[in-house]
Amino acid sequence: MNGSARKGNTLTAINAFIKGASEKNEIEIIEPDKLNIAPCKGCGVCQCSNGCVDKDDTNPTIDKIAAADMILFATPVYWWGMSAQLKLIIDKCYCRGLQLKNKKVGTIVVGGSPVDSIQYELIDKQFDCMAKYLSWDMLFKKSYYATARDELEKNKDSMNELEGIGKNL
């Protein structure tokens, strides 16, 4: 799940991960910024039916997430949190939360501050809470500091690390 609307460091990280993972796995990148998904209205109708009542890309997207064996959440840091694009999809997962239990997940977070800054900790905690609530097996959490568009790509150690994580799935 690519939480970035740009083709920058977050996508570079995803592609490095995919390079390692694609040998043994079928992979699809979901790009929320290219989908027509309305924000959750909190209407609660989804709790009595099998999905969201919005006639948009919500249900087909949640179907893909529910069918996946492993979910990678990748996001740039926006104001000490994940991107709005990624958060929108996560909010809409409420409509079928029980179908999303017991997934294997990993996170990649790319930001413009050193990786020991609070922004990464806050995002990790949010994903940890979701993982606990949905009984997810958190396989890995990786954070990277990169501000220039091609900065992460030039960091061979990071690229090798991400490819290795993908290979070891």
Predicted regions and their residues:
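Residues in intrinsically disordered, low-complexity segments of regulatory proteins
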Residues: 78-79, 135
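Short, glycine-/small-residue-rich phosphate/pyrophosphate-handling segment
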Residues: 100-141
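Short, solvent-exposed loop/turn segments at secondary-structure boundaries
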Residues: 117-120, 150-155
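Active-site rim beta-loop-alpha module in soluble metabolic enzymes
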Residues: 146-147
